[in-house]
């Protein structure tokens, strides 16, 4: 089975949607036809309800940091078990807009939640299930927030302080440095430069995994 799970990560305004299009175009140019898209939190009826609570909060009750992270993992296990794993088993490639790395960075770095607790949650909920490749779009938070604000109204998390996003970015960078399956892309460059870097990184990874010839075969 040659299906793979590729995740795109980064702060608000990093360009994840654009990156997803580039990844899909690159894969399809090499013969990958079956692609499933996911987003976190969300992607199933229950996970989408949790997404709304996480993103918008509640008018009459504060969402605590631990409640937030537990909702994220509840949404994640629904998505993984009901969508991602079945798609992979069916031979489809899955492209995810965020996955567990977001929780490790946002909740572990930004919120300051105990990292051992987060690792324990990850291992309990996901077991040894991990993305095959993660593309981390690295961007100074000030630039990302400026881009996010230009898109319109900010959600509950996007309204956090610059310091929150600085901590989140630092944790992303730490985690990327520890894991060879996480490739860092400089997202502060022009769209053309970012696109070229993503294409090059993805093609090199396909080659290293011995997948380039396999995915090209149907063409």
From Swiss-Prot:
Broad enzyme group: transferase
Residues involved in ATP binding: 10-17
GO molecular function: ATP binding; dTMP kinase activity
Reaction catalysed by this enzyme: dTMP + ATP = dTDP + ADP
Cellular component annotations (GO), alphabetically ordered: cytosol
UniProt KW keywords: ATP-binding, Kinase, Nucleotide biosynthesis, Nucleotide-binding, Transferase
Entry's EC annotation: 2.7.4.9
InterPro entries associated with the record: P-loop_NTPase, Thymidylate_kin-like_dom, Thymidylate_kin_CS, Thymidylate_kinase
GO annotation terms (biological process): dTDP biosynthetic process; dTTP biosynthetic process; dUDP biosynthetic process
Function recorded in the entry: Phosphorylation of dTMP to form dTDP in both de novo and salvage pathways of dTTP synthesis.
Family listed: Belongs to the thymidylate kinase family.
Name used for this protein in its record: Thymidylate kinase
């Amino acid at each position: 089975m040659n299906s793979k799970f590729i995740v795109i990560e980064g702060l608000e305004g990093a360009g994840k949607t654009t990156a997803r299009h580039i990844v899909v175009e690159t894969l399809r140019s090499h013969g990958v036809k079956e692609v499933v898209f996911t987003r976190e939190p969300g992607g199933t009826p229950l996970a989408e309800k949790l997404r709304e609570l996480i993103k918008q909060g509640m008018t009459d009750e504060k969402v605590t940091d631990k409640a937030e992270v537990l909702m994220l993992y509840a949404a994640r296990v629904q998505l993984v078990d009901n969508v991602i794993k079945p798609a992979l088993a069916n031979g489809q490639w899955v492209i995810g807009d965020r996955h567990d790395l977001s929780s490790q960075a946002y909740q572990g770095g930004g919120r300051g939640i105990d990292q051992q607790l987060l690792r324990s949650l990850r291992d309990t909920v996901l077991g040894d299930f991990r993305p095959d490749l993660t593309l981390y779009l690295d961007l100074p938070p000030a630039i990302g927030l400026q881009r996010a604000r230009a898109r319109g109204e900010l959600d509950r998390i996007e309204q956090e302080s610059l310091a929150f996003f600085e901590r989140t970015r630092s944790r992303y960078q730490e985690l990327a440095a520890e894991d060879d399956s996480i490739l860092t892309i400089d997202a502060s460059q022009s769209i053309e430069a970012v696109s070229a870097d993503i294409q090059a990184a993805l093609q090199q990874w396909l080659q290293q995994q011995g997948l380039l010839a396999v995915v090209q075969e149907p063409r």
